[in-house]
């Protein structure tokens, strides 16, 4: 029989594992964030390539790209099943970084659906973009992808408002407005606003949906944006079927 102190210590270690993992990810990302070149993420790109060599890649998957918020996003694969899903997050990477690695993150997988979740890094440290600059970067990424004449649908999240960075709220509101305006002329682009599902009655981000760092979503927050994506995908598919007479 194990002593009570031994059992308590073991349980404490189990509880600390997720925290240690997050601290490890953050420390890696902070170091990389100080490097302005997209090469800061070359090791993560190489790790994905190595994993792909021993995997059977799905046909026309849903590919989700972004920064740390994508790396920490769990459960989407099960929720969107039987659609195959590949999560391809890169530390605190920006949209410009993802454009740089287009071949590795998008072209290699030939997705039927591309999902983009921009992170807070767009407005801090490496970039400090304005809303207009972020939307321009997103449009550049989509235009590059479309230049290969491979038909696919694009689902683009507006950046998530976080409890920690209240100074970003006006930029995010303007980003959402500009994205919605642009998407009106882009039939293959759908804009998703996660903030309507993550705020309290006062319109500020609800801490119940975020980790203690005030930046990254917890499991409750991720469930809400996962359901938003799932419902939007299903709705668009039903509309497509209806347009060709399938019910």
Regions found by a protein language model. Name each.
Residues 130-140, 171-176:
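Charged helix-capping and loop-helix junction motifs
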Residues 1-61, 236-247:
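N-terminal secretory targeting modules
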Residues 163-247:
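Catalytic His-Asp segment of secreted/periplasmic serine-dependent ester chemistry enzymes
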Residues 70-79, 84, 97-135, 159-163:
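Oxyanion-hole/transition-state-stabilizing segment in secreted/luminal serine hydrolases
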Residues 61, 113-115, 153:
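Structural motif
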Residues 54, 59-75, 91-93:
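Catalytic nucleophile-elbow at a beta strand-turn-alpha helix junction centered on a G-D-S/GDSL motif
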Residues 84-86, 153, 188-190:
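Conserved beta-strand segments of alpha/beta enzyme cores
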Residues 117-123, 145-174, 195-201:
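Active-site segments of SGNH/GDSL-like serine hydrolases
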